[in-house]
Amino acid sequence: MLKINCGSGVHPLPGWVNVDLEAGPNVDVVADLGAGIPWPDASVDYIHSEDFLSCLPRIEQVRCFLSEARRVLRPSGCMRLLLPSLERLIEAWQQRPRWLVEHWQRAVGLPLDPPTGGHLVNLALKLNPGFFFDRATLEGLVDAAGFRLREVGYNESPHEALRGLDDRRPDQTVSVYYECDPI
């Protein structure tokens, strides 16, 4: 069984091939996944991507990655995505600004002056090298690449290999958990 963890950085997954743009002590394969995935067609069982997709600086790289993921996945395979949600970020700013600021200070640690939700949203959008996805945009990109998008729960999956991988609980993040099935 071949399982690849895309953009693994300092968060490798044991038993997975950990792939990142830069070499590191826990990186098994160095590759620019925004330009292609270095595996043969239909050779990968599972793909995991935590925050990687939102770090790609150009939407063309997102399209390339999704197309390549579809190419390398077996028909019975699945790709799990965890990525920041534009909807959840804006919802938190509107409904829970104090939580958003407290979470930022705890998880990110960059100073906010003034410590407000509006300042945080602007800073988050500026600092993110890539894209904050809303569901409609992500679904359009995923559909075009040949996948069906499903929102899933924290550490939940019909695929045993994809259960228990999530690093952050829903109360600790504005991210969303998705799985993409080849169609």
For the regions a language model picked out, list residue spans one by one.
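S-adenosyl-L-methionine-dependent methyltransferase catalytic module, highlighting the catalytic core
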Residues: 57-64, 68, 78-183
